Amino acid sequence: MSAADRRILIVKLADLGDLLLCEPAIRSLRTAFPAARIDLLVPPATAPLAHLLGHDLSVLTFPKSLFDNLTALARPNRFAQAVRFGLQLRRAHYNTVVVLHHLTTPGGATKQRWLARATSAANVVGLDNGRGNFLTARVIDLGFGAKHEATYMLDVARAAGGAPVDPAPQVDRASVQRGPALPADYAVIYPATGPYSSARTWPVERYGAVASALAADGLTPVVVGSRGEAQLGAHIRNAVPSTIDLMGATSLPELAGVVTGARIVVGGDSFVGHLAAALDVPRVTIFGPSNRDAWRPWGSVDVDNVDIDSTFNGAVVYHDLPCQPCLYAGYRLGRPEGCPTRTCLNRVAVAEVLQAIDRILKAS
């Protein structure tokens, strides 16, 4: 097969943070196949991130939420939409499909199997936890947290013929935009953790206390997030009037610009922490029920491993309980909304986060 004839479909039907963690895998494939057509299949909401990743990708979108419940296919309009999309995939004549997903649930595995078969590609590569009988090349899935998610996805790309590359997720810095004018010294706070699991969200009044302490130390708090999360930004702004509220006010390239200029970035398990890591910006990430070994921002270490003599610029703050993580543990989906008390998250005190911020600022 000539390089120009190679057609690769990368499947990542996930949120922004998960897509960013796939950047090394995408880079691995583009490095190995510079002349190939590489298409990236993502949900509509994450498509804008592809431009920030670079790598000369064509982007296809698939509204996976419409088909999360397979009984939805019984609706005539949904079934027709799925058939039309399947025909679109078939007409693209892909040689290889790279599935950058764990096959965690039977329904999820069925969805990936359908997408792969719709393409009629000869090669289908992905993680196998026992549900991957449709794969032609398999990477053994050792369970969530046995490897970092970025490492898992890079392993899949390598199994598809990808080149060895730096495993740290990166963004195309030429695509980063300056965004709003900000003071010279500021700290970014992202209080929300996205729509999938609100159980990862630390209490907003504690973010207000962190913002107050940062302001007292001469760092202007800058709050970022989506327009739908604006009430969290308003709460922090009311607590600390000097706060600059950019909730819903930036594009992704502008958000990257805001993060790039920050002295430190503070928040929960979500996209902005991964973006800070990709831009090599100091960061403190608060974990509750989700799996920190799987999803910690790349290069971030447990806060107890950070001291003023270290070179780490990212710390993870958490309380390790026997029941934690309860979201994406082993091979199970677990509990997206955590337990009713969310003890692991609520035990993280403001003082602990401020201590982590102090350690990272001194170390970096």
Identify the residue ranges that each predicted region occupies.
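Catalytic machinery of carbohydrate-active enzymes
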Residues: M1-S364
